[in-house]
């Protein structure tokens, strides 16, 4: 087990978000900002992680339940005060402790590991994670001496003209010698404009004691982004989306327009897949090799196998096997299974149903709570009537059956293998194997009756 520890600051309300949801629970690329930070922290293999909770603590704890210890900051009295809340869990332990805000979703595990290596190799008591900003306005500046040693952190409002020209900024992430951190926290106070305990004050305490403080500069400024409002949230989303899409492209996926493609962080895509513009892939979706998703397709928590073609359709919580074609304008709802080489065409809705291998439903159909066998033809306009206002009922269709167009199947009904359901029928009873089911009125022609209606030329 390592002697690395982590404190994630997640107690704040995030007033500028203008939301009832705690700030760290807003999502970027499908998971909360807090989860992004926790994943980065996990890369350093901490022996303990303590998450500081406060505003709506129960919601925050639910996200990391079983993954972190928690400490409650009942009053938000500053970053230093927040870290103090972790003392019962961490005080006295040998090693180094990361302190990181839960609203920094772009930080990477690689950067945190580099921070630890830098800290240990330089034998620092504290190391600040910094970044070079083209426009440092609003950030605390890192002030170094002529030898490049960190002297202090100066906030924007306190900086003189020279200090304001410094482009190295404090990201708000730190690595400390664990014992010295909690010793120094006992010496900070609220003698400042905000009346709060500032974590940055421990840096001054270390310097005054002649202890070594360093700074590790991030390679990518984007990683330093702290999200305080919806504008920054959108910025984080855009940066993360670019990272995700580029990762898939490097792995052999073709994107027609990556700037207009939205893929959550946990989505998996096989090589040689083609993703057209305005495709949205969410949750735990898996896309197989060589599968094509055309413009406008949306998939959530579904598994789509290799060599499928999904055209401008919605698929949710379902499984699509190899060689299936769906759409355009189809809706595959939760709990559905489309087996190998199934075809589901335009304006077809499938809900909690299984379609067997080679089955085709080409147009204007609703199949709900149905099990359809192999090589079945489902004609245009077929409707399974599966709901009586309270209960759902099942339709079963055997292999090689033929369901004629404009058929209504009032469940529960079983249609046998090789059966034929006559077009235009309303089916209320089972149809045996090899039988024809007909449920419609017999046609009757009345000669000359059309002349009585206003449309007829004789009436004009």
Curated annotation (Swiss-Prot):
Mg(2+) binds at residues 103, 228. InterPro entries: Bifunctional_GlmU, GlmU-like, GlmU_C_LbH, Hexapep, Hexapep_transf_CS, NTP_transferase_dom, Nucleotide-diphossugar_trans, Trimer_LpxA-like_sf. It catalyses: alpha-D-glucosamine 1-phosphate + acetyl-CoA = N-acetyl-alpha-D-glucosamine 1-phosphate + CoA + H(+); N-acetyl-alpha-D-glucosamine 1-phosphate + UTP + H(+) = UDP-N-acetyl-alpha-D-glucosamine + diphosphate. GO terms for cellular component: cytoplasm; membrane. The active site is at residue 363. UDP-N-acetyl-alpha-D-glucosamine binds at residues 9-12, 23, 73, 78-79, 140, 155, 170, 228, 333, 351, 366, 377. Pathway: Nucleotide-sugar biosynthesis; UDP-N-acetyl-alpha-D-glucosamine biosynthesis; N-acetyl-alpha-D-glucosamine 1-phosphate from alpha-D-glucosamine 6-phosphate (route II): step 2/2; Nucleotide-sugar biosynthesis; UDP-N-acetyl-alpha-D-glucosamine biosynthesis; UDP-N-acetyl-alpha-D-glucosamine from N-acetyl-alpha-D-glucosamine 1-phosphate: step 1/1; Bacterial outer membrane biogenesis; LPS lipid A biosynthesis. In the N-terminal section; belongs to the N-acetylglucosamine-1-phosphate uridyltransferase family. In the C-terminal section; belongs to the transferase hexapeptide repeat family. Catalyzes the last two sequential reactions in the de novo biosynthetic pathway for UDP-N-acetylglucosamine (UDP-GlcNAc). The C-terminal domain catalyzes the transfer of acetyl group from acetyl coenzyme A to glucosamine-1-phosphate (GlcN-1-P) to produce N-acetylglucosamine-1-phosphate (GlcNAc-1-P), which is converted into UDP-GlcNAc by the transfer of uridine 5-monophosphate (from uridine 5-triphosphate), a reaction catalyzed by the N-terminal domain. This is Bifunctional protein GlmU. The lineage of its organism: Bacteria, Bacillati, Bacillota, Bacilli, Lactobacillales.
